[in-house]
């Protein structure tokens, strides 16, 4: 999709679920920090604007974009978060290093989404020039950090709704006698 002269960070605030009870982790690459800090500011502003309390936001820094995978994994394992936003920036250079890092980070974040039950939002700019990154981190094309924060809220909400739906399905099966619990089972009917 062409994005020339379009600000992609505009969104309908009425379409955003209530986020006041969600907790978010943000893992930020220190490489290209003039860009990643802009993305972080966009994410923080969007989360706060959508009623996420500041104390429900945890930030960790990692050295580079490739380390976002490990940082996000550890955030998922050790912090009680509803979603993680991985923020990074890789800019094309003279070697294939760009391709390897972009592919590795993309696959790593994808793997975390497949292997865990907590969404990890990909907010890694993979641009050909510094100007393209500037344009997407608070410039003429908006702020991908803002978009990532909105995606994180929506995905946390989907996760919450799926969990509630699963609980209701189990309760329905129990009440219908379709499944039976052994004594001491962790699944209980809530009235």
Stretches with model-predicted labels:
Residues 30-31, 89-90, 125-129:
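Short, ordered loop/turn segments at secondary-structure junctions
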Residues 24, 54-56, 90-94, 130-136:
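Glycine/charged-rich beta-loop-alpha catalytic/anionic-binding loops adjacent to active sites
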Residues 33, 37, 41, 62-66, ...:
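Electropositive phosphate-/nucleotide-binding environments in soluble metabolic enzymes
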Residues 12-62:
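Glycine-rich phosphate/diphosphate-binding loop of Rossmann-like nucleotide-binding domains
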Residues 2-5, 98-99, 103-191:
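C-terminal binding/interaction regions
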Residues 25, 58, 67, 82-84, ...:
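Structural motif
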Residues 67-109, 113:
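Glycine-rich phosphate-binding loop
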Residues 6-11:
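N-terminal charged helix/coil linker that caps or initiates catalytic domains
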């Amino acid at each position: 999709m062409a994005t020339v002269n379009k600000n992609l960070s505009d969104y309908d605030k009425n379409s955003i679920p209530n986020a006041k009870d969600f907790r978010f982790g943000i893992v930020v690459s220190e490489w290209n920090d003039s860009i990643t800090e802009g993305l972080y500011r966009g994410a923080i502003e969007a989360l706060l604007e959508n009623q996420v309390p500041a104390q429900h936001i945890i930030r960790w820094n990692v050295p580079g974009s490739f380390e976002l995978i490990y940082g996000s994994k550890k955030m998922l394992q050790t912090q009680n978060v509803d979603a993680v936003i991985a923020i990074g920036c890789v800019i094309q250079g003279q070697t294939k290093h760009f391709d390897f890092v972009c592919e590795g980070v993309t696959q790593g974040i994808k793997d975390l989404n497949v292997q865990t039950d907590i969404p990890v939002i990909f907010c890694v700019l993979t641009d050909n020039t510094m100007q393209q990154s500037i344009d997407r981190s608070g410039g003429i094309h908006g702020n991908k950090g803002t978009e990532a924060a909105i995606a994180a809220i929506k995905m946390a909400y989907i996760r919450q709704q799926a969990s509630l739906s699963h609980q209701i399905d189990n309760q329905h099966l129990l009440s219908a006698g379709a499944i039976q619990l052994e004594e001491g089972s962790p699944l209980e009917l809530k009235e």
